[in-house]
Amino acid sequence: TKALDDVSLKIEDGEFVAVMGASGSGKSTLLKIIGCMDTPTAGKYFLDDTEVTAASRSQVHKLRKEKIGYVFQHFALMDYYTAYENIELPLLAANVKRKERKRIILKQMEHLGILSERNKLPGKMSGGQQQRVAIARALVTNADIILADEPTGALDQKTGHEVLELLKEINKSGKTVIIVTHDEGIAKMTDRIITISDGRIVGDSKEK
């Protein structure tokens, strides 16, 4: 069976989009394709002017590193690294110099209200603080597109809404933000809702 079937979708720069659907509907697969973590077996996918489906593995890796930041449901933080060290990882991968890394990280941590948590391990932080660390890590490389897979799924309602407000603020700064959620209340906080069922797009609020 196909995870996605006959999906046709265009997302403009600067949109704030929710991809909504039940578990197993194909929404996470769609996010992985958008994020260059998975390749469709048929059809084409363009990111800006690059045809990702025809690009080499190294080109796709470069696109992913330069253009995309990820936020996951269970934070995906390294348990034995401090908050600061977790946020530093993508900058190390990009060979950013130490002094510049420090400047970027501290600026993001201050902006997200987690500067006082910088030397803490993830296990010593609340879920909301851990998700803020994950968001900071997604932002430090100045990615154009932020992808968030169930970013509020492991949080209580109040903290989940705070995280969504943060993503909204990030979107207003000019970044494209795409979230996957099964929560209608969360989806309604975005500007556009795409609904997926059994691998097909069955609703797009932009077309109303």
Regions found by a protein language model. Name each.
Residues 1-196:
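ABC family nucleotide-binding domain
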Residues 193-205:
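H-loop (His-switch) and adjacent beta-strand-loop-beta switch element
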